[in-house]
Amino acid sequence: MGIEQRKKEWMESVDAERLWVPKEFGTEIDSSKKRKADMEQLPKLMQEPIITVGIMHAERIGFFFDSPFRCAEFPNITFDGEYEVFLSDDGRVSFFEQQFDSLHFTPIEEQDYTSEDGYFELEDVVIGINFHWERKENQRFKGGLTFMIEHGKVVAINEIPTEAYIFSVISSEMSATASLELLKAHAVISRSWLLKPIIHNEHNANAVLEHRTDDELIKWYERDSHELYNVCADDHCQRYQGITRARTENVRLAIEATRGLVLMSHGEICDARFSKSCGGVSEVFESCWADVHYPYLERVVDVKTPESVASAPDLTVEANAEAWI
C-alpha cells in the first residue's frame, strides 16, 4: 500500500473535536446571537476535568507554600511557608505530630495557572527515573496538594485542571521555546492521551499486561496501573514538572488555541501515544502495547520523500532489523 493511500485512510479515521468551551471563547465576537450559534456547533460540551498527578514518593517530603493554603484536616489554620510530612511508624502520614490517612491542601486565592505566583514547592523531586540522567530537583506547582500512603511511602499528589496540566506537559516533555505550531500539535496529542481512559471510563487499577510464550515474557504497566491518581509525573506517563519550565508566550498561546481539542476516531478519543525517537521507522501499536489494532497508529517511515518509503526494509525480519540498527 502506497504512502498516499495510507495517509488517506489515516485521515479518514481521525477527526478533531472540542470537548469544552475555550476560556476566551467569543470575546472577539460582536453579536451575541452569533456567539450562541457558534457555541451550538461545539459538540459534547462538558466541564473541564480535574486531573490528579502523582509527583513523588518519599519517607519525608518537604514543601513550601508561596501563598495561603487551607487544609481540610485543620480547617481553622491558614498555611503559608515551609512544612514537612513524614511516614509514621504505623504507616500513615505524620504532620504536626498527628497521624492521618491523607492530608488535603487547597489554595485560598484563585490562581492564574500561567503566572509564577501562588504556587507550592516540593523538595527533591526525582526526575528521569531509571534513566542515566536521573536526578533530584525542587519543583513548583499550582492547584491542590494531597499526601497519602502508597507502596510504603508518602506520595504527593497534585490536583489541577486539565489545561493547566497540559500547559506544563508540553513545556516539560519538549521545550517551552519550541515553535508555536509544534506546541499546538503536542497539546492536542497530550490532551487526547490523557483524557481517553478518563472520559471513556477505561480505568482499570493494577493494569499490568503481559504477553507470554514458551521462551519469552513481556510485561508492561499501563497508565491506569496507578490507583490513587490519574497519571504520574515522570516518563512512565507524561513528563510533568509543574511551572518550573512553562514560561513562554508560545506555550500560553498553544493552550488557548487548542483548549479542549482532542483527536477522535469512530466516536472515541484517540490513544495518542507519542515517542521522542522512532529510529527511522515507527511501530504499530499492537507490537508495543496491548493486542489491539488502531488504524491511526500505523507504521510510519521517517523519510524525506514519499518515494523513499518503498526502499525501507521489512523490519519484522531479524537480519533486516539488525542491519537497520
Task: Identify the meaning behind each predicted range.
Residues G2-I325:
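Conserved, single-site charged/polar hotspot
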